[in-house]
């Protein structure tokens, strides 16, 4: 008995599909398919509400059409088989299904075999095997086999197997097999297996296989196997396989296998396989396999495999495999070969030498190396094989100790020499 009932239901459903298909075909015939005329339709409706077959310009309910042409407003379920023509004024709301649903404004659920497009705005749940796009804004959940794009703003959850892009701003969760990009701002979670970037600012969690970049500021958690960069300021947690850089300031936790750099100031915890550098100040905890440098001031804990240097001053704890130097050095300094400056304060240690080149320079505190050479003034204690100072206010301990301004008999002394002249 149940089998007989099921067969009857299938038969009725098949008959209904046949009737709907026939009516849809007739609607296409009514419109002369390739040149549809506005207003030509077969309607079962009251006050433009009900069921329509054809190119009805204004309708509410269930509507079937071969191809939309000069449509004004449709609300409900709109099923079209062929891409629209001259339909930029149309406002379609509800469920739109077809090869390529098109209108001036599309809102609701839009399902297209190829995709869906709007001359102005596209909003809602939009699905297309190829692409989704709007001349102005795209808002909602947008999933396309190839790409999702908006001439102005793209907001929501967007996925494109190849690309996701917006002419102005991109906001939300944006995922792409190749690239995610915006001509203006990009805000949210943005993932492009090759790249993610914006012409202006980028804020949020951003991943690009080769690179993540912003023309202005880049803020948030940013990661790339290639590089992470910003034309102006870069702030947050940044991981770049090759490098991390900012045209102005770089702030946060930054790690890369190659280099980290900023045009102005670099602040935070910075880890680089090769080098760390800034045109202005470097402040924080910095580790580099080769070198660390700052155009002006270097402050904090700085550890480099080869060298640490600054155009003006180094302050804090500095450890270098070969050398460390700046015009002013303050704090605790250790160098494998040599350390130098014109004004050195604190504790300074080197296996090879410690040097003050300027006759008006000064070193104060504790210094220890094989050769301590102070052409200016030394205040404090020095330990070395050879200690040389132009002026001394303190004590030298070494094999040979030389103080230039001591009396002749006491200029050169073995083991110990001292002077406490003001």
PLM feature spans:
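N-terminal secretory signal peptides that target proteins for export/translocation
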Residues: 1-12
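Intrinsically disordered, low-complexity regulatory regions of eukaryotic regulatory proteins
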Residues: 7, 32-33
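Bacterial N-terminal signal peptides
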Residues: 15-27
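Surface-exposed, glycine- and small/polar-enriched segments that build interaction surfaces at terminal
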Residues: 33-422
């Amino acid at each position: 008995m149940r089998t007989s009932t099921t067969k009857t239901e299938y038969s009725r459903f098949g008959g209904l599909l046949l009737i709907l298909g026939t009516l849809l075909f007739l609607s296409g015939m009514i419109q002369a398919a390739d040149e549809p005329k506005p207003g030509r339709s077969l309607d079962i409706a009251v006050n433009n509400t009900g069921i329509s077959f054809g190119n009805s310009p204004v309708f509410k309910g269930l509507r079937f059409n071969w191809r939309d042409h000069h449509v004004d407003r449709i609300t409900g379920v709109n099923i079209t088989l062929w891409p629209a023509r001259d339909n930029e004024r149309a406002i379609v709301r509800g469920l739109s299904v077809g090869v390529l649903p098109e209108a001036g404004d599309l809102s609701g659920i839009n399902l297209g075999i190829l995709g869906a497009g709007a001359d102005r705005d596209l909003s809602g749940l939009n699905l297309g095997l190829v692409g989704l796009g709007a001349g102005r804004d795209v808002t909602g959940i947008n999933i396309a086999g190839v790409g999702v794009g908006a001439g102005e703003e793209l907001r929501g959850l967007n996925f494109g197997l190849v690309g996701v892009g917006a002419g102005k701003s991109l906001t939300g969760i944006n995922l792409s097999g190749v690239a995610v990009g915006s001509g203006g701002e990009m805000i949210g979670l943005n993932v492009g297996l090759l790249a993610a970037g914006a012409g202006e600012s980028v804020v949020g969690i951003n991943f690009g296989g080769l690179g993540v970049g912003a023309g202005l500021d880049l803020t948030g958690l940013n990661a790339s196997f290639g590089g992470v960069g910003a034309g102006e300021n870069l702030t947050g947690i940044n991981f770049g396989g090759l490098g991390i850089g900012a045209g102005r300031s770089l702030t946060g936790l930054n790690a890369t296998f190659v280099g980290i750099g900023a045009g102005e100031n670099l602040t935070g915890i910075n880890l680089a396989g090769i080098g760390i550098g800034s045109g202005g100040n470097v402040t924080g905890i910095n580790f580099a396999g080769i070198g660390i440098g700052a155009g002006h001031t270097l402050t904090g804990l700085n550890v480099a495999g080869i060298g640490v240097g600054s155009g003006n001053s180094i302050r804090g704890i500095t450890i270098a495999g070969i050398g460390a130097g700046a015009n002013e050095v303050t704090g605790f300094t250790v160098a494998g070969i040599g350390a130098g400056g014109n004004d050195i304060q604190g504790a300074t240690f080197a296996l090879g030498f410690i040097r003050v080149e300027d006759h008006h320079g000064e070193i104060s505190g504790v210094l220890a190396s094989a050769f301590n050479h102070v052409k200016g003034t030394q205040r404090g204690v020095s330990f070395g094989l050879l200690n040389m100072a132009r002026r001394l206010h303190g004590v030298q301990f070494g094999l040979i100790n030389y103080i230039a301004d001591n009396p002749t008999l006491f200029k050169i002394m073995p083991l110990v020499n001292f002077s406490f002249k003001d």
